[in-house]
């Protein structure tokens, strides 16, 4: 599952709550390129008795392909520090890409909205790792588009 720490709609605690209501007994959190939601996920799972598998979805470039690699951890607490450092670098790279995407979109949106898309606002909405759905929500909030689907159709797919 993905949480608000990447491109999901719910917090890690809310995911556990939804799983519990639907009688799910095992759940994994694998946000894109971040471990930020794992502590909350593990704590909430422990409180409900749901078996939790922490993980991460890492985007790996292989030749001209992006591959989404899922990694699961038996013991999150003893994770390799080098992996944590590498994930931090990936987060920083994701932020740079978001800045570039905002610049490209700012150049093609209607004139009255130019300059209104700000990285800080997208980051605040993201609560974690930046992803295109967070930018889409900010575009809806600003009135640039009427829905996140429209943001993707008109801008995010085309100018990514």
Walk through the language-model features, giving the residues of each:
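Extended substrate/RNA-proximal surfaces in nucleic-acid metabolism proteins
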Residues: 46-160
